[in-house]
Amino acid sequence: RFPNGMGNDSGELGHNLMDHHFQTGAYGTFDGFKNKTTYGRKPAGFFIPRFRNIGGITNRKDFIRGYGYQGGASRGSKSIANSKEELAAYGKRFKEIIVQDGEWSGSMGAFGEILPYHDNRMTLDYDKLDKWGLPTVTFNATIRENEIAMRKDMKEQAIEMLERSGFK
């Protein structure tokens, strides 16, 4: 009754694997607010909903669909590796260094989906079994021209937004 596996009468089970972009965006530091710090809870993050390919001037010819961003800002501790003296510090000097405030920084991570290409798929590998004797999962997927163009725009737009906000 199930020559292609249970629930796979159409032969589509495992095909059209989709994922989301990963590690695309930008990071920068901010020179202002040196007299400000945070105590307890940190500054809230932000969310920028999809703004590409929603009509008019937002439309792109090099990729379809759109993407958004999530991000935030924070002020870290001063790095203890700014000099050999600081790197070798211990005791009182070490404590003095690590309690100093570092730079304000901000980051934007892009998110958008990868298109459902038919040959992006997962399969069961009956030749490679797990410790319980069950087949392992094999993924075979790649990004294409649409995703490459989208990733390029994700990075460019994140950099532009951070720079216009005063980040370096």
Task: Spell out what each predicted region is.
Residues 30-37, 44-168:
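FAD-dependent oxidoreductase catalytic-site/capping-region signature
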